[in-house]
Amino acid sequence: KSEMNKQKFFPIDLIIVNFYPFEKTLINSKRREKIIENIDIGGPAMVRSAAKNFKNVTIITNKDDYKKFIDELERNNGKTTLKFREIMSSKAFGLTSYYDSVIADWFNKNLKIKFPEKKTIYGKKFQNLRYGENPHQKSSIYVSDLNNDDMGLKKISGKDLSYNNYNDIFSGLDILSSIKKVPTTVIIKHANPCGVSSNKSPVISFKNAFVSDPISAFGGVVSCNFKINKSIANEINKTFFEVILATDFDINALKILKRKKNLRIIKISNSKKTDTPTIKLFDRGFLLQDKDNIVFNKKDLKFVTKSKPTKKEIKEIEFAMNVCKFVKS
């Protein structure tokens, strides 16, 4: 400080920093050297020091805050308030924490370390939701897949998705990922399958899934690993559903489905299975385990009875085993 006074330097009261694009590099490059080169060192150090000194310094780390910063200056005679600086400081520490977590996760995956000594859960806010599982609970959804900013889902029509919608959607997608490439329909209610069917005919696949439990299916979420056509759309519209997901929809199907204005119509843009671990949170910590990605195969069956099942029965056993692991009691 004495040297600054001697040189008649003004104190720095504004820092604006953009980090090296580590995430983008991870997505676009497999070269280890290039990835490591894009680990920012000076940027995070500068941001942390400025954020710690929020009493005197404004730190901006997100371009979405540039306009807020300008508005703040205009409202306060060219200055920022302590509250604004503290909010920006909070965002800055959130960014450095997120940035370091992505880097640590990359190292752990490369070193095949599944259960590191220190573990952080990270993500980018995708959307604020109207409420959580119940109306009195506040909620947001976060994206942690670097390759899918839209979570692999493209909304075509309908209301915004709710907390319960998302919970049911990803439960359905998990089941679809365990089924072979036969046209399959999954109907989910309260994160539980109430109807699952595979058939060479997509329309029969939907009908069979629905008749499994038509009462529970009411107000559920339908997930299909095939393109929805006019005939399937007509069947769907006979019942009230919250959400319809499919790999695609033809023009005539969309015209029919859009008659129900509140129906959420979602195109599955990416259903690739990931090795993301399963996390269960509780008050004092969380449980972490490998995701149960094993697909049951009839080759794993051992028959210990004299009477052997038929080929049809074996096929049904295989199907049932791949579905029942998703049922929650």
Kindly label every feature range from the protein language model.
Residues 13-17, 99-101, 109-329:
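ATP-dependent carboxylate/acyl-activation modules
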Residues 1-111, 226, 280, 288:
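Active-site loop-to-helix "anion-binding N-cap" substructures in soluble metabolic enzymes
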